[in-house]
């Protein structure tokens, strides 16, 4: 389920918009994730105490983590599917240390798509959305395969 060169170009074009404000996009993605799927918040000791959207928006730690998440994802997307070296340590930490289920990767993928739709409607039409969905699915499938190798049934 690889992407065509044209699809990767659509993904990387919109990702260029994200890179203009990685921390802001990342914060918004995490807030959307936590609001839409409150159970995901339980995996983050640093953020468990944040109950309202205002508290989340005011949290520098949340913004920093959003920056970390989207910086890592951007590095993976830029590899256009050849992301083994980037994925291995990420899968290792998410499977063994953080115990993040694959389902939560689906949830954050949805949040990423929603944030891109709301922040960049002109650059994120149906074709770009389809391409990004495929790229995120490729990422999730490869993470799930690594999880399996590590014996994590997330």
UniProtKB/Swiss-Prot annotation:
Record Pfam families: Globin
Modified residues (Phosphoserine): 4
Signal peptide stretch: none
Globin domain location: 2-148
Sites where the protein binds O2: 65
One biological process term in Gene Ontology: removal of superoxide radicals
PROSITE patterns: GLOBIN
Binding annotation for nitrite: 65
Residues engaged in binding heme b: 94
GO CC, any one term: sarcoplasm
Subcellular location: Cytoplasm, Sarcoplasm
KW Kinase (keyword) present: no
Recorded catalytic activity of this chain's protein: Fe(III)-heme b-[protein] + nitric oxide + H2O = Fe(II)-heme b-[protein] + nitrite + 2 H(+); H2O2 + AH2 = A + 2 H2O
GO terms, molecular function: heme binding; metal ion binding; nitrite reductase activity; oxygen binding; oxygen carrier activity; peroxidase activity
The EC number(s) this enzyme carries: 1.7.-.-, 1.11.1.-
Claim: Ribonucleoprotein is one of the keywords in the record: no
Residues carrying Phosphothreonine: 68
Keywords recorded for this protein, A-Z: Cytoplasm, Heme, Iron, Metal-binding, Muscle protein, Oxidoreductase, Oxygen transport, Phosphoprotein, Transport
Assembly and oligomerization: Monomeric.
PANTHER family: MYOGLOBIN
Family according to the record: Belongs to the globin family.
Reported function: Monomeric heme protein which primary function is to store oxygen and facilitate its diffusion within muscle tissues. Reversibly binds oxygen through a pentacoordinated heme iron and enables its timely and efficient release as needed during periods of heightened demand. Depending on the oxidative conditions of tissues and cells, and in addition to its ability to bind oxygen, it also has a nitrite reductase activity whereby it regulates the production of bioactive nitric oxide.
Record-given protein name: Myoglobin
């Amino acid at each position: 389920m690889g992407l065509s060169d044209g699809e990767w170009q659509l993904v990387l074009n919109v990702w260029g918009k994200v890179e203009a404000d990685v921390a802001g996009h990342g914060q918004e993605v995490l807030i959307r994730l936590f609001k839409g799927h409150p159970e995901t918040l339980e995996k983050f000791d640093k953020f468990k105490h944040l109950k309202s959207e205002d508290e989340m928006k005011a949290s520098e730690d949340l913004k920093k983590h959003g920056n970390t998440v989207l910086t890592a994802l951007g590095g993976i997307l830029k590899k256009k599917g050849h992301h083994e070296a980037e994925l291995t340590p990420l899968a290792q930490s998410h499977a063994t240390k953080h115990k993040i289920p694959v389902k939560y990767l689906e949830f954050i993928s949805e949040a990423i798509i929603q944030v891109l739709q709301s922040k960049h409607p002109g650059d994120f039409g149906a074709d770009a959305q389809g391409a990004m969905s495929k790229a995120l699915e490729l990422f999730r499938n490869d993470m799930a395969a690594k999880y399996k190798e590590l014996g994590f049934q997330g």
